[in-house]
């Protein structure tokens, strides 16, 4: 099969939009081109991917390789697409099966040796991956962050061979257990310690309850810092 599709996620603040990595192998002079609004780090991934594939004892196809990162209008940055690109090339060239790829989303930077390096924004990715009913595959370096997503299925590996071994069924990876995080309110000064200042305290309570902005103006010594230091103690939990 000369076409393979692998799923990944971009990083956009706390969002992780889906990126479809399409790899097509065609006859012609050997080349590798990446399209789909890639940044510099993504364009440089072709050299990292080539070295990782060769050093993992796979063959790098001597064909014309086109890699499309869709959607085309979404900027792609970082080395997080190294792993899905490498897996797409291996799948399109028939070196690994394509049947299990639709069930996973991959993100990892590749070293030239084939080792997986950590990337930023793994937690938003694992949350979105779980919502899409897929399993996230991340570097071992990001395993602790990825398991914060609760019941989301997460697989972690240290090398490209770990991932290909799982996809081929030779050496399946064990899903990581979810980490339970308990919320703990920080120790804050108590607003009840403030004597008087009834109007100011009332303003703090209204701002905290309604999520309003608050501006304190006044000469030194009138209690602005005293009141501000006690505001966190009456704020509701973050969503």
Question: Which positions does each model-derived feature cover?
Answer:
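Post-Walker A helix-loop "phosphate-sensing" segment adjacent to the P-loop in P-loop NTPases
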Residues: 233-239
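Peripheral, non-AAA+ core regions of ATP-driven protein-machinery
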Residues: 1-226, 232
């Amino acid at each position: 099969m000369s076409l393979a599709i692998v799923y990944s996620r971009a990083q956009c603040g706390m969002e992780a939009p889906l990126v479809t990595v399409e790899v097509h192998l065609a006859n012609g002079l050997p080349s590798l081109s990446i399209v789909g609004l890639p940044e510099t780090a993504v364009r440089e991934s072709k050299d990292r991917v080539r070295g990782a594939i060769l050093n993992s004892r796979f063959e790098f196809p001597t064909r014309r390789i086109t890699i499309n990162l869709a959607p085309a209008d979404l900027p792609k940055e970082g080395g997080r697409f190294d792993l899905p690109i490498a897996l797409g090339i291996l799948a399109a060239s028939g070196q690994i099966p394509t049947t299990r790829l639709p069930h996973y989303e991959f993100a990892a930077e590749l070293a030239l040796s084939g080792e997986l390096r950590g990337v930023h924004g793994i937690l938003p990715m694992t949350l979105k991956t779980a919502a899409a009913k897929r399993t996230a595959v991340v570097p071992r370096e990001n395993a602790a962050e990825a398991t914060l997503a609760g019941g989301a299925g997460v697989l972690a590996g240290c090398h490209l061979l770990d991932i290909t071994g799982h996809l081929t069924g030779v050496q399946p990876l064990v899903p990581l257990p979810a980490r339970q995080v308990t919320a703990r309110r920080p120790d804050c000064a108590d607003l009840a310690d403030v004597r008087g200042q009834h109007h100011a305290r009332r303003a703090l309570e209204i701002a905290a309850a309604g999520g309003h902005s608050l501006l304190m103006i006044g000469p030194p010594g009138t209690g602005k810092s005293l009141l501000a230091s006690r505001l966190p103690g009456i704020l509701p939990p973050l969503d």
